[in-house]
Amino acid sequence: MMQTGSVTTPFGRRPMTLALVRRQTALADIKQGKTADKWKVFRDASAAMELLGIQSNSLAVLDALLSFHPETELRQEAQLIVFPSNAQLALRAHGMAGATLRRHIAMLVESGLIVRKDSANGKRYARKDGAGQIERAFGFDLSPLLARSEELAMMAQQVMADRAAFRMAKESLTICRRDVRKLITAAMEEGAEGDWQAVEEVYVELVGRIPRAPTLADVESILEEMWMLQEEIINRLEIRDNSENNSTNAAQSEQHIQNSKPESVNELEPRSEKEQGAKPSEIDRARSEPIKAFPLGMILKACPTIGNYGPSGAVASWRDLMSAAVVVRSMLGVSPSAYQDACEAMGPENAAAAMACILERANFINSPGGYLRDLTRRSELGKFSLGPMIMALLKASGQGTLRFG
């Protein structure tokens, strides 16, 4: 029968802690009749090794301990204390050195996977009754593995999910890096308008921030910024294409007018867009395209000054940023109507972000109100993106030498 209802303290100089007390008392709460396959539990513990704070040698010791339990299943009503000597345990742990063995036993105890059941003299043994059944044993109690079987399974699933997410994020980052690199190269080689050298520097800086051994959080953070850089590049190239198409269409229209014979005075008078046969959806398409909202964290990194004007002197949410933008608007002398127009054209979040950018370079902008109106006008025409402002501020952070406009 399984021994329950008692708390034993470690033999010798090993200290007793309240954590050990809690772990031992929790064993009494194992559900009546509960069972678990010991090797499945071992596989789950192996998968969750890093979360448990143990090492591969710790798993070798745990594997050896489980091999001393005669049954495949861990059962609530069974005897779950194993009592091998250090020599026997070291042999089954592939000849592990004594000092290493003791260190990893301590790690298994500390992680809550096993519990010591020390005898009065520290020896490991079992006392049997007249029928040869184990009456009492001293050694290592495996019942925490049974008690935590569901928890270990969930930890293993989480680790596998994180690994899958990490693989996908790394794959996405690799593809995005390739796309951005080739887009920049194409723009440079084909002489696209714009400061592509600066864009390339942003790309190189992003790649340089990838750690040698990145975590999932590292990859996701860089990937998000790389995606934004890719979108900004595509946006610049699309604006260039649209500008070229508009210039071509305008030239063709002018040539058509010059080659046509007007039949009435009305043909020389300005007409409305509807009179000219233009489709409203085409006219308003640029105005209806929403400006991409950048992550709040990136905006605050590029424009740290805005944080001083948030509620309680900090900006922790988009609502805080919009509140701070209203304060800054008044402080910089931007009229309510100019800011309202910006909110309608860009959206309130992007208008607040634009105010944060203007504040960050207020010393270099002669008329903040006029500057905001210019951004609003460009936004209405579909020719404005926050990307260049934010990327430029990130690059120039601490230098104070950049001008916009």
Curated annotation (Swiss-Prot):
Region called Disordered, residue ranges:
245-286
Biased composition (Polar residues) is annotated at: 245-263
GO BP terms: namely: DNA replication
Alphabetically ordered keywords of this record: DNA replication, Plasmid
Tell me, what does this protein do in biology? This protein is coded by a hairy root Ri plasmid, it is probably involved in its replication.
Superkingdom of the source?
Bacteria
Composition skew (Basic and acidic residues), residue ranges: 268-286
Among NCBIfam families, the record links this protein to: PRK13824.1, RepABC_RepC
**Pfam families for the chain:** RP-C (PF03428), RP-C_C (PF11800)
Classification via InterPro entries: RepABC_RepC, RepC_C, RepC_N
What's the protein here called?
Putative replication protein C
Which cysteine residues pair off into disulfide bonds? none
Organism of this sequence: Rhizobium rhizogenes (Agrobacterium rhizogenes)
Among its keywords, does the record have Transcription regulation?
no
